[in-house]
């Protein structure tokens, strides 16, 4: 599951699960476990009726805006040791410890193990947004071997390339959406509006929900 958090939110994510120092009793970091992450997301998703008007903690963040404006950043490590989440065009972006408005592309690239690509070409962004799948999933572009996820920061755009995982990848767009078998996705140049649209597997979704309820 490719979803990561900013340093400021990591502790809050762990607090939800009452994990201290980012570790569980199984000696795994709080974000490298698919089941733990699923539990946290599900808990946040089901607590939206109790949200406050001001986002003072992770569970207080308005759920619709939080999930629909998500974009992903990660390091080259499959363990996701660098955990960062971005909220496109959101005031919370200003409070990041790692990435702030005005940070140079080179600094961003250096911080994220050269996996982050800063894009300043509006034409490129415009071309990206012509792909329905990218537009619907917060500018997520799929290729044969990698996922490129972009976030708009002011007048600039920066993206990251993330190695594909063997497990199912879940994207959040107001609801859980399961996308399986990424090997079926062709390279970006071969994508067309028709091939970019994926049919989500309802059975996969049901299995995922069953696992989450079992864990809770």
Curated annotation (Swiss-Prot):
Domain of life according to the entry: Eukaryota
Note: Partially overlaps MDM34.
Name used for this protein in its record: Putative uncharacterized protein YGL218W
């Amino acid at each position: 599951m490719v979803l990561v958090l900013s340093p400021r939110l990591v502790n809050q994510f762990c607090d939800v699960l009452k994990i201290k120092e980012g570790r569980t009793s199984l000696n795994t970091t709080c974000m490298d476990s698919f089941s733990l992450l699923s539990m946290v997301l599900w808990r946040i998703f089901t607590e939206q009726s109790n949200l406050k008007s001001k986002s003072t903690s992770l569970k207080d963040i308005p759920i619709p805006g939080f999930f629909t404006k998500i974009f992903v950043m990660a390091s080259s490590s499959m363990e996701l040791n660098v955990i960062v989440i971005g909220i496109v065009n959101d005031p919370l972006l200003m409070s990041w410890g790692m990435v702030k408005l005005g940070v140079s592309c080179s600094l961003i690239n250096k911080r994220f193990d050269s996996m982050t690509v800063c894009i300043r070409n509006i034409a490129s962004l415009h071309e990206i947004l012509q792909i329905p799948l990218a537009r619907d999933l917060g500018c997520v572009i799929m290729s044969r071997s990698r996922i490129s996820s972009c976030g708009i920061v002011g007048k600039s755009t920066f993206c990251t390339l993330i190695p594909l995982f063997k497990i199912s990848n879940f994207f959040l767009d107001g609801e859980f959406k399961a996308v399986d078998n990424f090997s079926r996705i062709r390279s970006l140049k071969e994508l067309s509006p028709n091939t970019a649209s994926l049919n989500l597997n309802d059975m996969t979704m049901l299995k995922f929900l069953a696992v989450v309820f079992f864990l809770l």
